[in-house]
């Protein structure tokens, strides 16, 4: 007959020396400046990512005069392109750059900055320009999520502590995303005026907050350009 399916497998237990090495590697991750710098870079990238995801439709309506339908469609482009960027991030680094993450991280970090500048600094309704900006933004963010949010940290962390490295970067990233929502809300509401019974928003500070975050993400990524595994 068939072998029993409910027989539990023996769990492999680590020896005392293996446990000591594992714990040492976990602590080593927390003392690696490169991991924390990558975490900062990813956090600032997440600020720009969730700024557009959370506030992009409102921005297009209030600042540029788009309808809700058109604004939603334009922002949705970035999500689709983000999937494409994530899918091809490994091919980009392995095939085009010989496994190096720093060069594509710089290229797509600058792509993210360019996309935000096109999106935020060109006034008025320019449907195709804003659509192109969201294509660039989505591709850039999709690649950066893989590199800044994971692969670059795993590459330089001890092999038996890659999970800890991902944890540090992931926590920092979502802290950045959460702070972004609070800061963006404060800046938008704090620069609202009423003119002839109509709410008017000054997005100047929002523009520089979002673009500045993308620039800082690139800046911190450059700090770990030559970081190696310990």
Feature map (PLM): residue ranges:
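Juxtamembrane intracellular "pre-TM" segments in multi-pass secondary transporters
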Residues: 1-38, 63
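Extracytoplasmic gate region of multi-pass secondary transporters
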Residues: 30-89, 145-146, 150, 177-185
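Cytoplasmic membrane-interface "Motif A"-like loop-to-helix N-cap segments
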Residues: 94-109
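Paired intracellular helix-loop junctions of major facilitator superfamily
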Residues: 98, 152-162
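A membrane-interface helix-boundary motif in multi-pass transporters
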Residues: 100-103, 184-214
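C-terminal ends and interior cores of transmembrane alpha-helices
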Residues: 110-124
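Multi-pass alpha-helical transporter architecture, strongest
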Residues: 119-123, 208-230
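A late C-terminal transmembrane helix in Major Facilitator Superfamily
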Residues: 159-192
């Amino acid at each position: 007959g068939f072998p029993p399916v409910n027989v539990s497998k023996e769990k492999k237990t680590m020896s005392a020396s293996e446990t000591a090495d594992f714990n040492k590697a976990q602590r080593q991750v927390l003392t690696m400046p490169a991991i924390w710098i990558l975490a900062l870079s990813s956090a600032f990238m997440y600020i720009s990512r969730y700024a557009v995801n959370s506030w992009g439709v409102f921005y297009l309506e209030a600042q540029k005069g788009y309808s809700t339908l058109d604004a939603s469609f334009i922002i949705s482009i970035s999500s689709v392109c983000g999937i494409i960027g994530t899918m091809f991030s490994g091919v980009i680094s392995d095939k085009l750059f010989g496994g190096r993450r720093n060069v594509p991280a710089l290229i797509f970090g600058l792509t993210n900055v360019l996309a935000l500048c096109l999106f935020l600094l060109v006034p008025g309704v320019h449907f195709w320009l804003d659509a192109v900006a969201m294509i660039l933004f989505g591709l850039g963010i999709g690649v950066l999520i893989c590199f800044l949010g994971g692969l670059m940290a795993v590459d330089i962390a001890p092999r038996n502590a890659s999970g800890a490295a991902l944890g540090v970067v992931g926590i920092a990233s979502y802290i950045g995303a959460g702070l972004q929502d609070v800061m963006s809300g404060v800046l938008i509401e704090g620069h609202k005026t009423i003119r002839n019974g109509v709410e008017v928003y000054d997005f100047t500070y929002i523009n520089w907050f979002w673009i500045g975050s993308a620039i800082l993400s690139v800046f911190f990524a450059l700090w770990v350009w030559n970081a190696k595994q310990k």
